[in-house]
Structures are given as structure tokens and as C-alpha cells.
Amino acid sequence: MPRWPSDYQTGCIRERFIRENICLIDSVIKFSKANNVPGLLLFLDFEKAFDTLEWPLNRKTFQYFGFSQSLLNWLKVFYCNSENCILNNGWASNFFELNWGVRQGCPLSPYLFILSVEVLTNAIRHKKEICGVIVKDKEIKLSQYANDMTLILDGSEESFLESLKIIDYFGKISSLRLNSKKTEALWIGASADWDFKLCPEMAKKKQSER
């Protein structure tokens, strides 16, 4: 399925590999340092990503990408109005309905998730107020491997704040929320000219290094 996810996404797609993400981020860091270009990397972590994704977003995303109605009907059969139970030491709980999330271990789950997150990817890519790091005339804004996303920003306050706005809005329509304890930021290249208010621990570290 290489037609739909952007080139930034390498998870679960044939002929795309996680090493591409590592090489991309490493190249951006080295370029920023060598050319004294400011930049900010945001390593995003979504809370229980596969378990909380909203099904309505799945359906609308598949419609947007032009999947057939027949496939949409099958997805509805597999995921909508289904009942589940919990097995524990041979004991089965009562059945209950699930109205969100994609099943762990289901072969469809990675693709359902990737295509839904593509909504966030496109929003960031096309938002003019969000600027990435320009390497050899090519602007790089993000790197993705399934639910692991790294934003590659130019270090400006505007890019950072606009990114948070889009992520917050996406969270409202998808039920995906950032895990602030696991989301991390890393300055690269030249120092930024604004205070990083989100992470006070980072600000303290920056002050102690001066």
C-alpha cells in the first residue's frame, strides 16, 4: 500500500524500513550542527494509541483515500457492533461492546492506524505556519514509524505552537492524546531565541550549561 501514506511513514509498508527514520534524523542533526541552523525535534508519544483510536475517523479516512464501498462494508462488519470477552485462566467474562481502538494482533490494525494518522501528517505538512529544517533545498518536517512520530521543526516559537494546536485538534477527533511524560524535545544546531516553557526541566538544563 505505498500509494497512500506519505514518504515520511515507514511503518508496516513494503520496501520502507525503520533505518530510514534513523538515518533521516541523524542527517538533520548533523546538518544543523555543521551549518549552525536552529532546529527542534519533538518525539511524540500517544497514550495507548492503538486502543483509543476512534472508528468514525477510520471510516472517513478510508472514504477520503478512495477505498471501495465494499471494503468499507467489510470493515464495518469486522469492527462495528462487535462484542468481546476476556479470558483469564479458563474463565470467560461477560461479553461487552467495543466502540473504539484497533485490535492488537489483527493484521489490519497497523494499516487502519497508519491511514488514520495520515490525517495529522497531511495537516502538518500543508500548514504554512509550521516550518521544518531545510536541507539542500528540501524542507523536512517529520518522520514516522507507525505510531511513533518525530516533528522536525525550524526552532521557531510559531512552528512549535502551531504544531501543538494541530496535534490538540487531531486528538479531539481521533481520541489520541499526547503522553506528556514520554513526549520529549531536543534542541539541535543553533540556540533558539525563545524560552521553551513546555519543559521546565529542559530549561533548567539549558541554563546550567551556560
Residue ranges of predicted features:
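Nucleotidyl polymerases of mobile genetic elements and RNA viruses
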Residues: 1-210
